């Protein structure tokens, strides 16, 4: 990660799945809630734990609240809504710990380890889990990042590989440029037309 020189230079919010090496970087963090929903559903449905189902519902409700506020032209949740989300979140995590006390070392089943590890992450990094509720620039999940690399994997699946490293770099540059335009609500065809006319569109500050 250091060699790529991306995370160390960023000044925004790093949205990730909680992988510990990311914590070594001095940036604000947000955790991907698509991952949390999958894990909570696995615990709630697979092991019949109501707190997990309720917490998954709360995260979805918080997402809807943010979307409604954004649609209304707001850039924040009202204090009462935000307080309610935080209080209920804490109560559900506490219920989770009550149902899943820390297992004894050497006597942990696969389920116990997964459930307790999930609860620890949700508890210790609750501000990062809920960052999308306090900063509307932060998405609910990092699925967009995964979608950005999907075409690379699709190209590999169809063609096997690129014939040259230069070709791979050109492919990634084009996909990155198109993705950046979409994120800034720039019409892709119009942007590409400008590019071929020598009028390169770049995001503000680039």
Language model region names:
Residues 1-206:
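Catalytic center-proximal scaffold of phosphoryl-transfer enzymes
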């Amino acid at each position: 990660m250091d060699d790529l020189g991306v995370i160390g230079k960023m000044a925004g919010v790093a949205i990730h799945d909680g992988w510990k090496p990311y914590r070594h970087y001095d940036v604000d963090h947000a955790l991907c809630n698509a991952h949390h929903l999958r894990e909570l559903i696995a615990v709630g449905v697979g092991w019949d734990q109501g707190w997990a189902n309720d917490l998954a519902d709360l995260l979805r409700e918080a997402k809807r609240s943010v979307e409604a506020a954004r649609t209304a032209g707001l850039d924040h949740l009202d204090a009462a809504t935000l307080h309610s989300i935080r209080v209920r979140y804490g109560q559900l995590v506490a219920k989770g710990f009550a149902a899943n006390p820390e297992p004894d070392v050497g006597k942990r089943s696969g389920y116990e380890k997964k459930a307790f590890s999930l609860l620890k992450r949700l508890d210790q990094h609750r501000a990062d889990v809920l960052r999308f509720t306090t900063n509307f620039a932060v998405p609910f999940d990092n699925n967009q990042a995964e979608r950005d690399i999907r075409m690379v994997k699709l190209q590999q699946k169809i063609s096997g590989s690129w014939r040259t490293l230069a070709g791979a770099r050109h492919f990634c540059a084009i996909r990155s440029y198109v993705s950046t335009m979409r994120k800034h609500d720039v019409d892709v065809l119009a942007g590409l037309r400008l590019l071929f006319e020598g009028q390169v569109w770049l995001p503000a500050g680039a």
